[in-house]
Amino acid sequence: MPRPAVFLDRDGVLNQEVGYIHRLEDLQLIPGVAQAVRRLNDAGWFCCLASNQSGPARDYYSIDHVHALHHRLQELLAASAGAVLDAVYFCPDLSRPEGGVVADYAGWTTWRKPNTGMLVAAAWDHDLDLSRSVMVGDKATDIDLARNAGCYGILVQTGFGDRVLEGSYQHASQPDYIAEDLAAAVEWICTHLAPR
């Protein structure tokens, strides 16, 4: 039977929002994030990273660098609280009008948020029920992705979340819940939704 998942954006949700991360050591967890992910692990949720990462398309760094950043993220989560991301999905693509310059990644794709490609692929790969799943992010595109995929959408106020709420970043979105940070989002998830 398909199970639900918690999909997590990366920058501004799990790690500090510092723009494009060129050095591995600049990827730093937001305080309390590892414990929040561990709580989801312990409660039986499938935890999956779902993140737009256009650095390779913009020619800022290689796809291998993105993989190294995700390896560091997993190491920090494990070292801090024994937390685990069960799967990692990301979109390195960006269309040319949006700034994509590297031919291999400069195009439109169903994987780039708010399109549903990453979540549909994860659902297929891991037998997930999107209608009972949650997308947690700090941008309007995360909430739009949740709507497009039929998931619950939680906007965290870390990263760009406050600017989304003010209407000064992207467009107004209507999340199912607004949380101060990932720990508060996980509290809401564990109180209102069941992982099975």
UniProtKB/Swiss-Prot annotation:
<dbReference type="GO" id="GO:0008270">
    <property type="term" value="F:zinc ion binding"/>
</dbReference>
<keyword id="KW-0378">Hydrolase</keyword>
<dbReference type="Pfam" id="PF13242">
    <property type="entry name" value="Hydrolase_like"/>
</dbReference>
<comment type="subunit">
    <text>Monomer.</text>
</comment>
<feature type="binding site">
    <location>
        <position position="138"/>
    </location>
    <ligand>
        <name>Mg(2+)</name>
    </ligand>
</feature>
<dbReference type="InterPro" id="IPR006543">
    <property type="entry name" value="Histidinol-phos"/>
</dbReference>
<feature type="binding site">
    <location>
        <begin position="51"/>
        <end position="54"/>
    </location>
    <ligand>
        <name>substrate</name>
    </ligand>
</feature>
<dbReference type="GO" id="GO:0034200">
    <property type="term" value="F:D-glycero-beta-D-manno-heptose 1,7-bisphosphate 7-phosphatase activity"/>
</dbReference>
<feature type="active site" description="Nucleophile">
    <location>
        <position position="9"/>
    </location>
</feature>
<comment type="similarity">
    <text>Belongs to the GmhB family.</text>
</comment>
<dbReference type="InterPro" id="IPR006549">
    <property type="entry name" value="HAD-SF_hydro_IIIA"/>
</dbReference>
<feature type="binding site">
    <location>
        <position position="139"/>
    </location>
    <ligand>
        <name>substrate</name>
    </ligand>
</feature>
<dbReference type="InterPro" id="IPR023214">
    <property type="entry name" value="HAD_sf"/>
</dbReference>
<keyword id="KW-0460">Magnesium</keyword>
<feature type="binding site">
    <location>
        <position position="9"/>
    </location>
    <ligand>
        <name>Mg(2+)</name>
    </ligand>
</feature>
<dbReference type="GO" id="GO:0000287">
    <property type="term" value="F:magnesium ion binding"/>
</dbReference>
<dbReference type="GO" id="GO:0005975">
    <property type="term" value="P:carbohydrate metabolic process"/>
</dbReference>
<keyword id="KW-0862">Zinc</keyword>
<protein>
    <recommendedName>
        <fullName>D-glycero-D-manno-heptose-1,7-bisphosphate 7-phosphatase</fullName>
        <ecNumber>3.1.3.-</ecNumber>
    </recommendedName>
</protein>
<dbReference type="InterPro" id="IPR036412">
    <property type="entry name" value="HAD-like_sf"/>
</dbReference>
<feature type="site" description="Contributes to substrate recognition">
    <location>
        <position position="112"/>
    </location>
</feature>
<feature type="site" description="Stabilizes the phosphoryl group">
    <location>
        <position position="113"/>
    </location>
</feature>
<feature type="binding site">
    <location>
        <position position="11"/>
    </location>
    <ligand>
        <name>Mg(2+)</name>
    </ligand>
</feature>
<dbReference type="InterPro" id="IPR004446">
    <property type="entry name" value="Heptose_bisP_phosphatase"/>
</dbReference>
<keyword id="KW-0119">Carbohydrate metabolism</keyword>
<feature type="active site" description="Proton donor">
    <location>
        <position position="11"/>
    </location>
</feature>
<feature type="site" description="Stabilizes the phosphoryl group">
    <location>
        <position position="51"/>
    </location>
</feature>
<dbReference type="GO" id="GO:0005737">
    <property type="term" value="C:cytoplasm"/>
</dbReference>
<feature type="binding site">
    <location>
        <position position="139"/>
    </location>
    <ligand>
        <name>Mg(2+)</name>
    </ligand>
</feature>
<feature type="binding site">
    <location>
        <begin position="9"/>
        <end position="11"/>
    </location>
    <ligand>
        <name>substrate</name>
    </ligand>
</feature>
<feature type="binding site">
    <location>
        <begin position="112"/>
        <end position="113"/>
    </location>
    <ligand>
        <name>substrate</name>
    </ligand>
</feature>
<keyword id="KW-0479">Metal-binding</keyword>
<keyword id="KW-0963">Cytoplasm</keyword>
<feature type="binding site">
    <location>
        <begin position="17"/>
        <end position="20"/>
    </location>
    <ligand>
        <name>substrate</name>
    </ligand>
</feature>
